[in-house]
Amino acid sequence: MIRAIVTDIEGTTSDIRFVHNVLFPYARERLAGFVTAQQHAEPVKTILDNLRRETDAPAASTADLITTLFAFMDEDRKSTALKALQGIIWRDGYLNGDFTGHLYPDVLPALEQWKAQGIDLYVYSSGSVAAQKLLFGYSDEGDITHLFTGYFDTLVGAKREVQSYRNIAEHLGHAPGTILFLSDIHQELDAAEAAGLRTIQLVRGDRDPASHHPQVQRFDDIHPEQIPA
């Protein structure tokens, strides 16, 4: 019996184009000015200090760090410091109404149904927890954060590492086999499966021939009550 569902965001609940064509450019355009203006104020000061440790560059100037952040964006590096800064910048965008968090139309009804069945819902994304809460708090369907019991980001581990999913299962307090992980990336599902979790792959486009995981196109194709123990 599935007791908890952990879902990815990009390509799973939300169109990856929203992230890459809206969120990333919005943060990139504002990053240098924001960091320069806020470098001595919290939480930016601590984030920059963390970035110095992350890059083993304790003497790096703010200008050096900004250059590093742009390089990380070009590489799509899953840097915790970068994700934290992006999340702060995106917050202004959501609050100003510059955009709303994209949700596929099949997502909300399924989440509500699973919640009504007594299944705990969680999010696991490479974006910061703050950014996750913003996307679901200012989504196309309004604030749906009340549906989620908790959120995980790269602080729990990288998404393609088996230990990350062991950490999540331990935090949830459920047996791994009672946790269902949803993602569009089969390498993430491979890691989750190796940790004992159940898996389903969202394929919003063509099927993934390299994947052995069950594949569905929509959230309403997922029936957790039918997944055998």
Curated annotation (Swiss-Prot):
It comes from the Bacteria. Its EC number is 3.1.3.77. GO terms for biological process: L-methionine salvage from methylthioadenosine. Residues 207-229 are annotated as: Disordered. Its cofactor is Mg(2+). Monomer. Belongs to the HAD-like hydrolase superfamily. MasA/MtnC family. This is Enolase-phosphatase E1. It comes from Klebsiella pneumoniae subsp. pneumoniae (strain ATCC 700721 / MGH 78578). The gene is mtnC.
